[in-house]
């Protein structure tokens, strides 16, 4: 998914009341989204359209260094219209720091209380050209605490074709969240579990009105096994986080360990008044003693609000362009700088990546997006 279709998928999860932050898969998402900057490769252009509340399409073309593209379609029985506010539309695409919600119970009548007569579902398909690679996603809310996501990928190289399928079942009870995965690649099966401590919210509607500053603890683990390759993997992790309540700045502190390879990672991320985000990540290997430190930052430029005093009216007009400056640097010498901005209905990204400790070439890219 690109940024536009991903924004629609996030809107689907938000409007159906699914707490994606309560998954072990997304334990370190707040820091990863800030540090792992995606720099456009060459010159890219996206054209997106939402002709109806339930249907969206996207065309993407890459002109440099090689010519390729893709076309994708998305359909859902959920109203996926993005906010009409200009800055809200921009922030929907560019916000990277994930504001976590407190754990809450899913009531039996949650979906009907939100106005859904049928169980919410979403279908997404993407065709890459000229490789004819096909991607598909099907997501359905089986019940208030259960969610199912099926991902498929079909590729063709000459006369050889391959199809892979990933089944991802999620069950969120508020106090804990269970994930079971199965992939046809290597016949891999995985199990993830996340436990939460702290005050459990009675429902989604009460968690949205949280005013008290209460930090929450989350502890989880995962294990997976590949039957074809006889490969085993495991990891454990913990997270301490707070929620945005209008008084205190939200933060997220995580620590994960892969005991097989001895890889230890700790992260810290915080957001200040939705205008700046600071993030750090420290990696250490218990066996080789190798380490790495990464720092990330986001600075948002807001539109200035000016009152028309000449005619003594209360009309407020906005001037200037929205934008966000992203910066990521590591002790390996990697420096990544990106600027995301909006000009009328166009979103653009300009970025570069430099390795300061070597003579490798500098990467530079431009990405344009238009939606209506």
From Swiss-Prot:
It is found in: Mitochondrion outer membrane. Keywords: Membrane, Mitochondrion, Mitochondrion outer membrane, Transmembrane, Transmembrane beta strand. It is a multi-pass membrane protein. One of its GO terms (biological process) is mitochondrion-endoplasmic reticulum membrane tethering. The keyword GTP-binding does not apply. InterPro entries: Mdm10. Its main location: mitochondrion. GO terms for cellular component: ERMES complex; SAM complex. It holds the Pfam family MDM10. Lacks alpha-helical transmembrane segments, suggesting that it resides in the membrane via beta-sheet conformations similar to those predicted for other outer membrane proteins and porin. Component of the ERMES/MDM complex, which serves as a molecular tether to connect the endoplasmic reticulum and mitochondria. Components of this complex are involved in the control of mitochondrial shape and protein biogenesis and may function in phospholipid exchange. mdm10 is involved in the late assembly steps of the general translocase of the mitochondrial outer membrane (TOM complex). Functions in the tom40-specific route of the assembly of outer membrane beta-barrel proteins, including the association of tom40 with the receptor tom22 and small TOM proteins. Component of the ER-mitochondria encounter structure (ERMES) or MDM complex, composed of mmm1, mdm10, mdm12 and mdm34. Associates with the mitochondrial outer membrane sorting assembly machinery SAM(core) complex. Belongs to the MDM10 family. This is Mitochondrial distribution and morphology protein 10. It comes from Schizosaccharomyces japonicus (strain yFS275 / FY16936). The lineage of its organism: Eukaryota, Fungi, Dikarya, Ascomycota, Taphrinomycotina. The gene is mdm10.
């Amino acid at each position: 998914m690109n940024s536009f279709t991903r924004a629609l998928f996030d809107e689907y999860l938000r409007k159906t009341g699914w707490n994606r932050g309560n998954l072990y898969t997304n334990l370190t998402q707040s820091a990863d989204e800030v540090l792992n900057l995606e720099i456009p490769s060459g010159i890219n252009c996206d054209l997106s359209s939402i002709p109806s509340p339930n249907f969206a399409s996207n065309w993407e073309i890459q002109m440099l260094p090689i010519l390729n593209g893709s076309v994708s379609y998305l359909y859902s029985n959920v109203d996926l219209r993005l906010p009409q506010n200009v800055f809200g539309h921009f922030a929907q695409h560019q916000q990277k720091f994930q504001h976590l919600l407190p754990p809450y119970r899913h009531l039996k009548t949650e979906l009907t209380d939100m106005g859904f007569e049928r169980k919410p579902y979403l279908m997404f398909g993407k065709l890459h050209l000229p490789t004819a690679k096909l991607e598909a996603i099907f997501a359905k809310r089986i019940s208030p605490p259960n969610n199912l996501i099926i991902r498929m990928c079909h590729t063709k190289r000459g006369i050889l074709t391959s199809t892979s399928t990933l089944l991802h079942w999620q069950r969120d009870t508020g106090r804990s969240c269970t994930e079971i995965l199965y992939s046809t690649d290597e016949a891999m099966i995985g199990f993830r579990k996340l436990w939460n401590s702290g005050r459990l919210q009675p429902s989604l509607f009460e968690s949205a009105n949280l005013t008290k500053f209460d930090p929450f603890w989350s502890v989880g683990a995962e294990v997976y096994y590949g039957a074809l390759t006889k490969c085993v993997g495991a990891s454990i992790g913990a997270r301490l986080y707070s929620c945005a309540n209008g008084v205190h700045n939200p933060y997220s502190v995580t620590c994960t360990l892969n005991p097989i390879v001895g890889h230890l990672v700790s992260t810290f991320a915080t957001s200040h008044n939705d205008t700046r985000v600071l993030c750090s990540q420290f990696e250490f290997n218990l066996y080789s003693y190798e380490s790495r430190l990464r720092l990330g930052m986001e600075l948002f430029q807001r539109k200035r609000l000016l009152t028309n005093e000449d005619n003594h009216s209360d009309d407020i007009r906005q001037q200037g362009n929205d934008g966000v400056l992203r910066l990521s640097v590591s002790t390996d010498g990697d420096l990544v700088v990106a600027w995301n901005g909006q000009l009328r209905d166009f979103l653009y990204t300009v970025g570069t990546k430099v390795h300061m400790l070597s003579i490798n070439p500098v990467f530079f890219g431009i990405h344009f997006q238009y939606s209506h």
